[in-house]
Swiss-Prot record:
Its EC number is 2.4.2.7. The keyword Transmembrane does not apply. This is Adenine phosphoribosyltransferase. NCBIfam families: apt (TIGR01090), PRK02304.1-3 (NF002634), PRK02304.1-5 (NF002636).
């Protein structure tokens, strides 16, 4: 199936010169969504990945992470922006091109012996994925790899990530 044909391009969003890759058109296509999750599942199995948890990055990582967790018989854990989780959290601050940001995960969500797979809809510069891996490694989790629907090749995000399996389905 040609997944790229199910992604809508929105020029000049969120600002001039940017082409936004809109996944909502993939999400509302039943066969495309099923194919996406089935393909992610198959690729994870091909790599021999057997995570205890899928860690979904806010917020579109949740959309693909939950069904992938179900398929892999794993739990699901959200990583969120500050102030979005109600209980005690672990956090990590990371640098952006112009400033910094931080991510949080519930303290009781994972433990040092857990194996995790990080999932998001898209990898661009890799900063958020790298920070998520850093947060999980700080806790003592074993990061097994990463899974993304879309990779923006020219932004070089893959090179910033640890030498682990990186699954992508669509390249731009």
């Amino acid at each position: 199936m040609d997944l790229k044909s199910l992604i809508r391009d929105i020029p000049d969003f969120p600002k001039p010169g940017i082409v936004f890759r809109d996944i909502t058109t993939l999400l509302n296509h039943p066969q495309g969504l099923r194919y996406t999750i089935d393909t992610l599942t198959a690729k994870c199995r091909d790599y021999g990945l057997s995570p205890d948890y899928i860690v979904g990055m806010e917020s579109r990582g949740f959309l693909f992470g939950v069904p992938l967790a179900y398929q892999l018989e794993a739990g699901f854990i959200p990583v969120r922006k500050p102030g979005k989780l109600p209980a005690a959290v672990h956090s990590i601050e990371y640098d952006l091109e112009y400033g910094s940001d931080s991510l949080e995960i519930h303290q009781d969500a994972v433990a040092s012996h857990h194996k995790v797979l990080i999932v998001d809809d898209l990898i661009a510069t890799g900063g958020t994925a790298k920070a998520t891996a850093g947060l999980l490694e700080k806790i003592g989790c074993e990061v097994l790899g990463f899974a993304f629907i879309i990779e923006l090749i020219d932004l070089g995000g893959r090179e910033k990530l640890p030498d682990l399996p990186i699954i992508t389905l669509i390249d731009y």
